Amino acid sequence: MTYRFVEEEFKNNFSWKSTDVTSADSLRIAHTQDQRFKLFPYKANGKSPIVTDTKEVVGDFIKTALKAESKDTDFSKLIKKVENEVAIEQENMNSLFSIIRMMFYNEGKFISDNIGMYAYKGSSDNKSVERLAIFLNDVLKVDQDIVHAITEAQKKYPYNALEELVIQCLDAVPSKDNQTEPGYYVVFEDAGKQFKKDFIFMLNSGMTGSDDFADLLALYYLYYTSQTCIVLDHFGSGNRDERTPLYFALDWEKVSANRECCKGGWKILQENVKHIFSHAVTLELLNQTDDSDEMLDYIRFSELVENGTIDDLETAAEIRKIEKIYTDAVGDYKNFYQIPAMNGKNETDVAIRRLFSCVHTQFINKRKSANDKYVNKLIEFYRSRWLKNRKKSGLVFNLTERDIIFLTKLSIQNEERIRLIDLFKEYEKRGVYLDNSSKILLQEFFTKLNMLDKKSDSGDAQYVKRIL
């Protein structure tokens, strides 16, 4: 295998303009991303809505998993179908229409908020919601085992007569899977492995309400994206399966600046998050090749170099070619020469780090607005769902009582109880770390709820009981 950058692909996909058309001292490309390499489901513009509530995503997530499409959910069209199905007096028919409107519509939008109805959700007006649903399906690796569990849960749902009538009239059918473009690239593998276990447990145990599913998606949206941001900043030295601890505080506890939740949580991650648009563009640049079937990220480049599939020096030379063409096209920034020398795992990794630095440097100096609009799509989700302002200590990842109960249910699953120290390990498998002060307060919380079997003062002999 030989890695080759295709200049014509770059020029076409990045809307390159020659100096015959525009000044050499101007920006002569569009900073394209999400075409040849799909990293995050965001757009670098202010028109694209920010999704902060994962409850909006639940229906589209299930629909995407099942590859299901509903027919038109417009109320006026639905009641015409109902009228053809039901033989009753017109006066009673009008009452039936009113009941359908009350039960299944809110502000003109069809409501699908249980496992029996999710697949019949109409098309969303918010394309950001649809993109996020597809992204989560891809990066959390929804497979046939999960699809089977969803369909089994649907079969067990006790549909009432009115729901059955509406479903019959909406007539949702599976769509043909004719997707030709690649899905989102999975940078961090561990999130999908744990998600599968938790999602199937919830489906099998009846935790299928929209609030529970929203909590699950919020947790794994956080887990995947936070770890991915960190892995990306390690370039070719990143590890797809290695978690970086990110510490949380309990909602009701007081914190100080020297606590892990302040030093080792959002304070660490926020710097990584600021780089995601530059990573998206860099990876798009690296994938301007004649092979559109395989996406290559930083780790994959290093793997191919290490196993001898691609030549290190030749590949590094190709990437330096990308840098030259790219920096030449960004004619309104003149200080690329000030970027310091890089170190890396191999010559290819060094060249990639240098290319990224070129992309990021011009964003923070010339095009900060575009960068911020992209990055804020993720930051605003964190801020709305997971961060709490601790005044002098700043923003800190936060767990509410509801979050704790939910995490504990996922951790214990079908067991009757779990050792307290093992419970903390289960939290960590889902990306949630607590320091010793938080662990002591959490132990007190479980005691107040009568959830703790205290066999001795030793943590090894304390068990948290299953939540019914």
Language-model regions, residue ranges each:
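Charged, amphipathic alpha-helical stretches
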Residues: 1-108
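Long, mid-chain structured domain cores
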Residues: 77-257
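Long, internal scaffold/assembly segments composed of regular secondary structure
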Residues: 207-338
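Long, low-complexity, charged/polar intrinsically disordered regions in eukaryotic proteins
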Residues: 313-398
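Positively charged, polyanion-binding regions of nucleic-acid-associated proteins
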Residues: 399-416
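Short acidic, hydrophobic short linear motifs in intrinsically disordered regions
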Residues: 416-430
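Short amphipathic alpha-helical interaction segments
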Residues: 432-445
